[in-house]
Amino acid sequence: MTGKEFNAYCKSLKATTHVVQWGNAHVWKVGGKVFAIGSWDGGGWEDKEPAFTFKVTDIGFEVLPQQPGVRPAPYMASRGLKWVQHYESPGLSDNELKDYIKQSYDMIVAALSKKKQKELGLLP
């Protein structure tokens, strides 16, 4: 997945906002809470390939880093948060990456108050 594809996918999710911060990282939020971070072209990480960071379940945090190209997210995981980073090929396929980003988005939305979800148009 390219950085452009990452941004387009995150933008397609309802009520998201985008900001560039933390050394040119592309940070995607819903309700003011981060659900995905993308970095490329020297945007904060030294890796040559794009890096995509996202929240995962407890099981995902145990299983995903066993795959080549996926590791616990360097900053987030060191603070006890369940985030992983796809940082090099072969890693996850684009479809798998989109699925995990969507799951991250869904977890963040579920953690928002019902009032906030309604304000964002995420509840009927």
Where are these regions (language model features)?
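Charge-dense, helix-prone N-terminal extensions
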Residues: 1-124
